[in-house]
Amino acid sequence: MTNTRKTHPLIKIINHSFVDLPTPSNISAWWNFGSLLGLCLVIQILTGLFLAMHYTSDTMTAFSSVTHICRDVNYGWLIRYMHANGASMFFICLFLHVGRGLYYGSYIYFETWNIGIILLFAVMATAFMGYVLPWGQMSFWGATVITNLLSAIPYIGTTLVEWIWGGFSVDKATLTRFFAFHFILPFIITALVVIHLLFLHETGSNNPSGLISNSDKIPFHPYYTIKDILGVLLLILTLMTLVLFSPDLLGDPDNYTPANPLNTPPHIKPEWYFLFAYAILRSIPNKLGGVLALIFSILILMIFPLLHLSKQRSMMFRPLSQCVFWILVADLFTLTWIGGQPVEHPFIIIGQLASILYFIIILLILPAVSMIENKLLKW
């Protein structure tokens, strides 16, 4: 008698994706982040669902409904802070996942890669709209500043912004629609994740060496299910340490002040995971130029397969490219730091230099270094 897991129409799909999936025998802990992102998504959807049961998306009651969740709902504080800090863990895993893809040349699977970038945009949009919902000062002014960027679009900009706002400023209509979109987007993300996995399983996983590993595959279960559990435990440990010991570490104190359209906070800044893009946006004095730089700072990931000029896929055996890669990482840390600083000397010039360096490394230095390495290896 054949095994149900191999014959049942539904269970068969799960079996081929998570149990009998042929996996390279040498993938490192850097390949854990896919499953960790899946876990983050599940945590966010579940905590978000319970928060939505108590939250009201009205300008008069939104702030007090979040207060009510934290004070009066059973374990409401836990659910709220797990959701807020879960977003931070989500982005940490996302950045590491993308970084792994860049380092080991996973972008060669360009369908999987491009869907991954669409996923990144979708998660960023969801996080932005979620940040508006508590209706604190930074929620309100963050929404005002970021949506206002669309007014830089020639001809239709102003109309577009008012259409998104549902009025002449960020108000009740804006909050209600942001809540609706914030609720629906995670399910769209889940559908995209399925497509992401579908494309990945067409080709199989990459591995640290960047070489074809068809001759040496092992089943996903039990080897990588056990290996992933370590990552899961570390993720939950980090998240719960953050939630239980310093839940407001990554938040902004201004968001504990209810939204007031008449009082602008001294420093408007987004959550930490958007600071690198915010620094790039601010480094260009022109509004439209800044918006374009902001979009291209993420979209540039899509052209990585075209910029790959090396004869080797992975950076594992390319020390020069490794150096450039880690300079890029340091540059992103610099941009993140600058994004949280006020717009004054010397932060302005540091931000501008870091922004220019970001684009130069990706568009010029990495491809050039790849060519040099090819020459050194007489390829």
Curated annotation (Swiss-Prot):
One Gene Ontology CC term in the entry: respiratory chain complex III
Keyword set, alphabetical order: Electron transport, Heme, Iron, Membrane, Metal-binding, Mitochondrion, Mitochondrion inner membrane, Respiratory chain, Transmembrane, Transmembrane helix, Transport, Ubiquinone
Cofactor binding description: Binds 2 heme b groups non-covalently.
Highest taxon, organism lineage: Eukaryota
Sequence intervals crossing the membrane: 33-53, 77-98, 113-133, 178-198, 226-246, 288-308, 320-340, 347-367
Sequence positions that bind heme b b566: 97, 196
Record membrane topology: Multi-pass membrane protein
Major localisation: mitochondrion
Subcellular location: Mitochondrion inner membrane
Gene Ontology BP annotations: mitochondrial electron transport, ubiquinol to cytochrome c
Residues noted as binding a ubiquinone in the record, renumbered to the chain: 201
Sequence positions that bind heme b b562: 83, 182
SUPFAM superfamilies: a domain/subunit of cytochrome bc1 complex (Ubiquinol-cytochrome c reductase) (SSF81648), Transmembrane di-heme cytochromes (SSF81342)
Entry-linked Pfam families: Cytochrom_B_C, Cytochrome_B
Cofactor requirements of the protein: heme b
Protein task: Component of the ubiquinol-cytochrome c reductase complex (complex III or cytochrome b-c1 complex) that is part of the mitochondrial respiratory chain. The b-c1 complex mediates electron transfer from ubiquinol to cytochrome c. Contributes to the generation of a proton gradient across the mitochondrial membrane that is then used for ATP synthesis.
Assigned protein family: Belongs to the cytochrome b family.
Oligomer and partners: The cytochrome bc1 complex contains 11 subunits: 3 respiratory subunits (MT-CYB, CYC1 and UQCRFS1), 2 core proteins (UQCRC1 and UQCRC2) and 6 low-molecular weight proteins (UQCRH/QCR6, UQCRB/QCR7, UQCRQ/QCR8, UQCR10/QCR9, UQCR11/QCR10 and a cleavage product of UQCRFS1). This cytochrome bc1 complex then forms a dimer.
Miscellaneous remark of the record: Heme 1 (or BL or b562) is low-potential and absorbs at about 562 nm, and heme 2 (or BH or b566) is high-potential and absorbs at about 566 nm.
PANTHER family: CYTOCHROME B
Name under which the protein is recorded: Cytochrome b
Species name: Spermophilus xanthoprymnus
